[in-house]
Amino acid sequence: MEMRQPAVAGQFYPLHCENLEKELTRCFEGLEIREREVFGAVCPHAGYIYSGKVAAHVYATLPEADTYVLFGPNHTGYGSPVSLSRETWKTPLGTIDVDLELADGFLGSIVDTDELGHTYEHSIEVQLPFLQYRFGRDFKILPICMGMQDKDTAVEVGSLVADLVSESGKRAVIIASSDFTHYETAEHARETDSEVIDAILKLDVPGMYDSLYRRNASVCGYGPIAAMLSASQKLGGSRATLLEYANSGDVSGDMSAVVGYAAIIVE
C-alpha cells in the first residue's frame, strides 16, 4: 500500500505521538467541545504554536462525519493544477485512509489524481492530527490540493464535491485550509482580513475575490475557501460564523510583520 509520509512533523507540529497529543491538548484548553451542524470551515495551517489554538476553535465544533474533504493551497508548485491524493496518509497519531469511493467520482474532471502535489505540501497535513485527536480513526479524508485558485476553478471543484457527496449519501464536512494576510503590520493585516472575512461571512465568493484584488491581499488559500463555500452552500449551508481571529504576533510579540489566522464555520 502506498503511504503519504508526514512532510512537516517535527517542524509545524511535534514529531512524537505523546508530544503531539500534549500540544493538541494545549490547543483545546479552555474550549468546550460542542458539535454543531457544520457543513464547511476555514482553518489556519501555520505551526501549532502560532495557529493551533485558532484551528481548535473550528475542530471543537465539528460533528462526526464519514469523510472530511480537505482543500488546501499548493505552496510548493509541484504536481497538477488541482490534485487529489489516493494514498493512505500517515501522521504521528496513526494512518488515515482516503475515501476512494468519492475519489473515483473525479475521473475525467478538472481534478487529477496526483500524489506529487501533496508530497511536500503542509496545508492539508497539519489539519489531520486535529481530526485524529477529535475523532480517533473512524473517518476517511478526501485531500485536494489547489495550485489553480481562480474563481471559476474553485467553484467548479466545490460544486463537483457537493454533487459527489450528495450522490453518495455520506455525511461530509469540508475544510478549507488557509492563513490570511502575510507579513504586514498587525493593524494592516486586521484591516485587510476583516474585509475578506466579511465577504466569506456573507458566503459571497465573487465579493471575496473582489476584496482580495482590491486589497492585494496575501491570503494563501483563497481558492480552497471559495471551493468550500460553493460546496457548503450546495449541501445546505446558509450562514457563516467567525469563531476566532488572531495573528502570529499574539504569540511572538512582533506586531510589525504578522500572519493572520481565522476560524470560520458554515452551518
Swiss-Prot record:
Q: Which Gene3D superfamilies match?
A: LigB-like
- Stored InterPro entries: MEMO1_fam
Q: Name one Pfam family in it.
A: Memo
Which chain positions lie within coiled-coil regions? none
Signal peptide residues on this chain, from the entry's feature table? none
- NCBIfam families in alphabetical order: AmmeMemoSam_B, PRK00782.1
Write out the similarity annotation.
Answer: Belongs to the MEMO1 family.
Protein known as: MEMO1 family protein MA_0601
Task: Please report the organism this UniProt entry assigns to the protein.
Answer: Methanosarcina acetivorans (strain ATCC 35395 / DSM 2834 / JCM 12185 / C2A)
Q: What lineage is on file?
A: Archaea, Methanobacteriati, Methanobacteriota, Stenosarchaea group, Methanomicrobia
